[in-house]
Structure formats: structure tokens, C-alpha cells
């Protein structure tokens, strides 16, 4: 598949007109009338997709797939507007911007699997996956100046001969501007294992696990690190079930290792890490008729807590107690 994308981004920006000394530490930014902004960009991508299925025997099947996929940037990250965030005396000037020229990040994927069906409803499988991801979007910082209506550059009135008022010796106001940019690459690979065994009397068990690795993991000792993959962790699930034509009940245990949720925090610097977590759930249903079903769900039966921390294990950020939750209902299909 070949895709061509034209991007038009519209926004409204009130231009900064000057900085005024407010008190001993702060300055106040003045703004003019809002003006419309429009930017245009384009990009094209080739997205091949190839898959193959090989029946080695009646019970043994091999599968393979190679593909390229893209993930487009969010609309918020493509905003053409610059927001002034800090105007303190002494050169502490910061701002944030979107980037209308952002391109999607691309993933070249390889998936291989081998499945063995040793009974009518029982199988074991192993799979390998590898993803080469390029053009990741990360936040970067650059110096930014602002041009005024008369063509001159905005100055910082706290830097001249008179630190309390504007004068001829004032320096150009240089803001540290944070904005998203393309550029980072990463490799992710891992294995997926699965086993399902069904007994003759309707009982069965299901187990699966994922082992994942990456070359873009968080280094807790590198405070200048600006890129690491989020959401990656090992996990496994164990399910016991009983099924008949009318009844179905499942007891599921889920475990997930700790993972980086975000490279930022709601307050303060540093990453947000979700610690390893386990949960036990139950669900069941009864078919009253071919079209009506009664069901129930029990979530987090053992009332586990979610713990979020910062860079190190003693940097507690949040303990989330969602409790045990039950749901009952009726489903209809007409």
C-alpha cells in the first residue's frame, strides 16, 4: 500500500508584544490581537504487507508475516501555536510549541509462529516478533526568539543597565522552547508462548506469556535521557474455564512486570513507572435462550493496589486502590 498525506494545520496565536517588570522576580508578558495561523506539509509512505501460512502436517502449522505500519502524530502535538510558560527575571524564559511538520513514526515488523494442534480444542504455540521503529516523536528543546511588529526582536528588560525597567542595554529575550520532533529509533523483539488444553468434560486451562526486550529502555541513572519506550514489560496469564452449551465460567490470573508509563510526571521531573502488578478476575454467563444471556463479572477479587513510582523504588508517586468490583447484567441479541 502506498499512501500520500497532505496536512493543513490552522490555529490562532496572540503575538507577544513585550515583557514588563512585575516584581523582584517575575515579568509579565503582553500580547496583541489574535491572528490566524495556517501551515501546510506533506509526506508519503510505502506500507508493504506479506503473510504466509504453511501446513507442515495436519496438526502443525507455521505462519510468517512481514509488514510496515505507521502511527500518525496526535493533533495536539501538531498545534502551530507557541505558549509562553515562564517569564522570570534573569533569563528564566520558557515556552512550548507544537510542530505542524511532524511525520508519523514507522515500524517494520516481522512475526513468526509455530502452532501444534494436538487435540480438537487443544494447542500449543510459540511466536517470535521483531519491530524496527524509526522516526519516534520525542520532546526536544531549542532557543527561540520572537520578532515584534516593527521587525525588532523581543528584549528582556531585566538584563540591561537598569534591571527594573527597559533600557538600551537590554539583551534579546531568548526562550527555551520545548517542542516535539521526529528522530529517535528503537528495536523491540520478544517471544509469545501459549497453551490451551481442553478436557472432555468441558473444563480447560489456558496459559500464555510474553517476553519482550528493547534497546530503548529507561536508564534510571541518566537524568538527561529524553527517550525510552513506554508500556513494555513481560506478562503472563493463567485461565481456568468451564464451558457447556448453556454455561460458561472463567477464572483468570494476570501478572505484568513493571513498566515505564510516561517519561514525565504530573508534578516534578522524572519518569512515571508502574510497579509489577497481579490481578485475579472471574466471569460467567448462562444462556437463558438463544438470544438472551445472563452474565456476571468480578474484577480484582484479591483487592490488589497499583503502585506508581519515580526513577527509583523509594520515589513513591501514587497508590491506587480501585477495590473489588462486581457487575451483573443481561445481554440480548435480536
Say what each PLM segment does.
Residues 1, 65-67, 127-129, 206-210, ...:
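Transmembrane beta-strands of outer-membrane beta-barrel proteins
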Residues 41, 70-125, 131-133, 172-191, ...:
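Outer-membrane beta-barrel signature, preferentially recognizing the C-terminal barrel domain
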Residues 130-132, 137, 142-265, 302:
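Gram-negative outer-membrane beta-barrel transporters
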Residues 50-54, 112-116, 128, 193-197, ...:
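Residues on the lipid-exposed face of transmembrane beta-strands in outer-membrane beta-barrel proteins
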